Amino acid sequence: MGIFKAYDIRGIYGQDLTEADFYKIARAYAQFAGVQGGRVVVARDCRKSSDSLFESFAKGLVDEGVTVLDIGLGSTPMSYFANGSLKADGSVMITASHNTKEWNGCKLCKANAVPISGATGIKDIEKLVAGMTGSEPPNGQGRIEKVDVSAAYGEHVRKFAHLARPVHVAMDFANGMGIAESVAFKGQDLLTHDDLYGEYDGDFPNHDANPLHVETLKDLQALIRANPGKYAFGVAYDGDADRAGFVDEKGDVIPMDFTTALIAQDLLKSNPGAVCFYDLRSTKMAEETIAASGGRPMMSRVGHSFIKEQMRQNDAIFAGELSGHYYFKANFTAESSSMATYALANIVSASDKPLSELVEPLKKYSQSGEINTKTVTPPAEILAKIKALYADKARVFELDGVSVDAWESEGYWANVRMSNTEPLVRLNLEGKTKEIMEAKRDEFLAIIRA
């Protein structure tokens, strides 16, 4: 099956994955993670296939002697919170995240919300599933226990609020699991919000729940622009609410690495000297802002499982990824889009400037954006060529792909990575000036496309 991905299990329901597959995956997960006889949190999103897939997954866990802690409809951050706060042995989130309605899947964790990725277990689970018929006798007799964590989760997230004045926010839930996150804003008088698409609908009828694609933000932008001065900013959640995109009070998109810098700035006020991670595609201003705010900036490779591992190893309080994942030590070193929302609200409430003016200094340098190139030459050969060409001209390192750091000598940095799933090479580059960026961008693209 091609459903076993780098970070989760995902496919088109009824075509790539079925209830029978989910039953086997559940049993394989229980065996691999060693949770037989233990307690596992299971949450699900609002897709039309999620209920029946939950029933099959729960049956598989029960047949491995697992007590299933069924938290019902919930966001991925809520499932992480339940895993950690209930001291469970693992958690499962049934979701296909931002994928369209035809898809479904699951995200698997061990205890303390430690993710199981392709590199740390998904491939092992795939092998176990391949050896199953689905008619194996039970290895135990577990049970299903319904647990409601929504109120506790809301209280947990609200601890992040330290607003100096009222802040009014526009929220686009895209008919997805951001709706479950709204519990985090109940009982907080200083943060109020107006909502778009706040009814669960697994068909996602209004737009895809993917804030990484700017076109999905159009309705949120239109709401803000139709009401000048009403909203401090807007937030759009993805399908399972572990990612968020933000727009300012004018409806203009805030780049996600800028959001990383702003959130770190807020957190470091109460955590001086703490480590904050930014992913290696981020603007240099993320690193500089963290340092200027009294923090210790550290660069991470791309991918949530890698980032979480690096955060734990370095006792980091926060990490931000260019994809819109924002990770908090306070949420068991996992994502919380609502904590990110509170962090921005905290910043706005403490300033006499609107968010657009707080973002402006972060535009100091010139970024290429991510440029993807389909190549005939094997991507590994291209990366090796870049490493050889620049080894004597700059600091070259291989945290994720090949990075070339000539910031001090020539005023630019570049990162060239392979796609995990396609024959693509991805280039991200930033220059101290637009002229430097464009010249170096063209130089690197000429090598990649040769």
Spans of features found by a protein language model:
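Phosphate-binding and adjacent anionic-ligand microenvironments
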Residues: 271-450
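An N-terminal, well-structured beta->alpha segment
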Residues: 1-59, 63-65, 143-169
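N-terminal small/polar loop signature for handling phosphorylated ligands or for N-terminal nucleophile
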Residues: 39-104, 185-247
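Proline/glycine-rich low-complexity loops and linkers
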Residues: 71, 123-155, 159, 250-322, ...
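Gly/Ser/Thr-enriched, mixed-charge loops and adjacent short helices
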Residues: 104-229
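General beta-strand structural signal in soluble alpha/beta enzymes
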Residues: 5, 42, 68-73, 93-94, ...
